[in-house]
Amino acid sequence: MLAKRIIPCLDVRDGQVVKGVQFRNHEIIGDIVPLAKRYAEEGADELVFYDITASSDGRVVDKSWVSRVAEVIDIPFCVAGGIKSLEDAAKILSFGADKISINSPALADPTLITRLADRFGVQCIVVGIDTWYDAETGKYHVNQYTGDESRTRVTQWETLDWVQEVQKRGAGEIVLNMMNQDGVRNGYDLEQLKKVREVCHIPLIASGGAGTMEHFLEAFRDADVDGALAASVFHKQIINIGELKAYLATQGVEIRIC
């Protein structure tokens, strides 16, 4: 069995790490490189960086910090933000990123997933899915351009359909960003994760809602996700990664202990 992964997420805007609640009202957390270094030293299995306004601004992720991160950490990291071409991806990988993640550009042009996978290998290609539960309809819908609340829009895709579509097109991993839970720290949406797990046959990463160590355990034990991504509990030092992993190990979760 592959070890489960603990993945801090760093949302980047204007060269700073920021964090919002339900993808809104972002506050500045701090500088990118020191935070990345701290998480690597605490025992993170990998890091994910989202340039949250790159797609909505119509630009590729600002690459100036990618090589600086690569110099100070020795764990894999993934970069996302406005990657719309093979050239965009090649540049980011050449600066030292191990994976690239696409979200809004994949919705705009699903063939991009296949072209990236063919060029760089499926192991490099992550698809992020921003999913919102509509209580009125009881359905999960995929959202686009979520980095800018004034431009965020609901797409025609229901989440489970899009999960299956991106797999067919060559995604190597899916990060499921559950927008209703984002930043509120009351637990991952286990019901949604279980539904996605049933149709997702590639690595699945849960994102949105972690507030306690038990929330991570529930995601691994009850929804069988491959990794759990979190931001605010790590940024605000509510949970220490090393202590979290020790706890998970005592609960029988296969985890890499530093």
Curated annotation (Swiss-Prot):
GO cellular component, one term: cytoplasm
Disulfide bonds: none
Functional pathway: Amino-acid biosynthesis; L-histidine biosynthesis; L-histidine from 5-phospho-alpha-D-ribose 1-diphosphate: step 5/9
Record: active site: D11, D130
Record-linked SUPFAM superfamilies: Ribulose-phoshate binding barrel
Enzyme Commission number(s) of this protein: 4.3.2.10
One MF term in the entry's GO annotations: imidazoleglycerol-phosphate synthase activity
Keyword Coiled coil carried by entry: no
GO biological process: L-histidine biosynthetic process
InterPro entries: Aldolase_TIM, His_biosynth, HisF, IGPS_HisA/HisF, RibuloseP-bd_barrel
Catalysed reaction, written as an equation: 5-[(5-phospho-1-deoxy-D-ribulos-1-ylimino)methylamino]-1-(5-phospho-beta-D-ribosyl)imidazole-4-carboxamide + L-glutamine = D-erythro-1-(imidazol-4-yl)glycerol 3-phosphate + 5-amino-1-(5-phospho-beta-D-ribosyl)imidazole-4-carboxamide + L-glutamate + H(+)
Location in the cell: Cytoplasm
Keywords for this protein: Amino-acid biosynthesis, Cytoplasm, Histidine biosynthesis, Lyase
Function field: IGPS catalyzes the conversion of PRFAR and glutamine to IGP, AICAR and glutamate. The HisF subunit catalyzes the cyclization activity that produces IGP and AICAR from PRFAR using the ammonia provided by the HisH subunit.
Quaternary organization: Heterodimer of HisH and HisF.
Family that this chain belongs to: Belongs to the HisA/HisF family.
The protein's name in its UniProt record: Imidazole glycerol phosphate synthase subunit HisF
